[in-house]
Amino acid sequence: MSSVKQEEVQFAPVEIRPMHDLDVPVIVAIERAAYQFPWSEGIFRDCLRVGYVCRVADVGGDMAGYGIMSIGAGEAHILNVCIRDEHRGRGFARKVLVYLLERARASGMYEAFL
């Protein structure tokens, strides 16, 4: 993970960008820090491979979190959303969720499940 201090990114805008293979090690570290039963690296790589909507919340070059969604059959499934502890409480998860829901709607999905 980056050594960017929280004070340096306090007011930095969040960019919701595509997740890439190179992001997976950091994503796995965020996942392991947040959950008692985290997803494996293989699960994240499979999500990328099959074309799920996989996005990263990037704050000034620091990966703050991520969101993953599958879409199809008229519905969207938000499978995972996680924000690193030091970035929580600043609305980043909301921005990830809004992005995912907008993407689902643009793809013609009528229902979303979390």
Where are these regions (language model features)?
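Terminal substrate-recognition subdomain of acyl/acetyltransferases
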Residues: 1-12, 105-106
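A short beta-loop-alpha structural element at the N-terminal edge
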Residues: 13-26
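Residue-level recognition of the GNAT/N-acetyltransferase active site
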Residues: 20, 84, 88
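Active-site rim helix/loop that mediates acceptor-substrate recognition in acyltransferases
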Residues: 34-68
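A short, glycine- and basic residue-enriched loop/turn
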Residues: 70, 75, 89-90, 111-113
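Conserved acetyl-CoA-binding loop-helix of GNAT-fold acetyltransferases
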Residues: 89-106
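Conserved GNAT acetyl-CoA-binding A-motif
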Residues: 104-114
